[in-house]
Design a protein with these regions (language model features):
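TPR-adjacent "capping" and linker segments in tetratricopeptide-repeat scaffold/adaptor proteins
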Residues: 25-33, 94-98
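Ankyrin repeat A-helix N-terminal signature
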Residues: 44-49, 77, 81-87, 105-111, ...
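Ankyrin-repeat and related helical/solenoid repeat scaffolds used for protein-protein interactions
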Residues: 162-205
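Ankyrin-repeat boundary/"N-cap" motif
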Residues: 32-44, 65-81, 100-107, 128-138, ...
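Ankyrin repeat domain, specifically the short helix-to-loop turn at the C-terminus of the second helix
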Residues: 57-63, 92-99, 119-125, 150-158, ...
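Leucine-rich solenoid repeat scaffolds
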Residues: 79-86, 91, 95, 194-221
Length: 221
């Protein structure tokens, strides 16, 4: 999932951004050498295409923190794209190149100590959202770190439990799926951006134990 078209003029900007966190701020500067299409292409590549990210960044280092505007309020950088789809290789590469570590990316990477530190420093960070308004909990679910997910949920990051379930099922994290189903009240029949339910994904990926668990709790394909 790479964002949504809203029928408004798209914009490509470079910004200093801690966009996922509550204390977010923006410094936007238009860069004449970067076209809107180029920034959009780079951000889309950030959703898991490491080879393309490497190539584009080597040719245009200014793309690193380039942000594409899907709408007037929905900006996305390549590392935010990597964080929302759970692409560890892309996120780690962009961090190595100097991209800012946002709390959503830290959660996706399973950096529990870093996430906890940021929430201690600013409790409002528990309500952080990434690109497209995706909450913190689904990002953390990509990591498979049950303790991290439990910590976030206990401290108020309970939005996005259905998306978190989808991510856990996609990765085959059985223990995390069990915990989410029993504690986080996800919609077991919610559909992802491909129109698939968690049970459909489990069956498609031949995750029989997860599929059995979901059926026991009333999930449908």
């Amino acid at each position: 999932m790479t964002g949504r078209e809203h029928g408004i003029p798209a914009r490509a900007v470079l910004r200093t951004v801690i966009g996922c966190e509550r204390e977010s701020y923006r410094v936007q500067t238009t860069n004449a050498s970067l076209s809107t299409d180029m920034v959009r292409e780079f951000v889309i590549a950030g959703h898991g295409n490491l080879e393309k990210v490497r190539k584009m960044l080597e040719e245009n280092p200014e793309l690193l923190n380039g942000s594409y505007a899907w709408s007037e309020t929905d900006y996305e950088t390549a590392i935010q794209g990597a964080a929302q789809v759970g692409s560890v290789p892309v996120a780690e590469y962009l961090l190595e190149k100097g991209a800012p570590l946002e709390i959503c990316a830290a959660a996706m990477l399973g950096q529990k100590d870093e996430v906890e530190r940021r929430i201690r420093d600013n409790p409002d960070n528990i309500n952080s959202k990434g690109a497209h308004g995706i909450p913190l909990l689904p990002h953390a679910a990509w990591s498979g770190d049950l303790e991290l997910v439990q910590y976030l949920f206990r401290n108020g990051a309970n939005a996005g439990s259905s998306s978190a379930l989808h991510n856990a099922v996609t990765r085959g994290y059985y223990d995390l799926v069990v915990w989410l189903v029993e504690n986080a009240s996800p919609d077991l029949n919610s559909k992802n951006f491909q129109g698939k339910t968690p049970l459909s994904v489990a069956i498609e990926r031949k995750q029989e134990t997860i599929a059995h668990l979901l059926r026991e709790h009333g999930a449908n394909e």
